[in-house]
Amino acid sequence: WNLDGVDFVTGVNNPTYKAYIDFASANGIEYVILDEGWAVNLQADLMQVVKDINLKELVDYAASKNVGIILWAGYYAFDRDMENVCRYFADMGVKGFKVDFMDRDDQYMTAFNYRAAETCAKYKLILDLHGTHKPAGLNRTYPNVLNFEGVNGLEQMKWSPASVDQVKYDVLLPFTRQVSGPMDYTQGAMRNASKGNYYPC
């Protein structure tokens, strides 16, 4: 979790995320993503929060520091109760969702992206469509859609370093993928180095 010299155990808990919020506030970063692990995953129910997270307390703390909270959500859990999830968390003060694992571009998933954008817009929530295909204009219709993954971002270095020449790929991205629209690259996931002189963790 990259926090040294703190008086708490780092992880998916309020003290860790308060430290992230403090950092964001001090450095003019508008949002902090409460990443995977905040909700009880086995039930795929976004209304069940893990015991180490007091979500309302975090949202209020972030608001006091002029930072918004974005919640990571798996696609299935988000889709199965989208209206209630968006209403509930918007009322709490959450600013948006980062939805993940759509992982395909068929008609059903494209329709899901539109439903998610429309529902989030209805509740004035921003949306990061992570784990989805490249953009095709959805963010023009729904400006609350911040970005789309649709790319082998830096997180790829965690599981496929030998098969990806990330440096070469990154140099090409502005001229290939980036032309189609905003991109969720997941920067910061690993160290930046050329293929010949790094070993991923």
Residue spans for each PLM region:
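Conserved structural scaffold segments of CAZyme catalytic domains across common CAZy folds
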Residues: 1-64
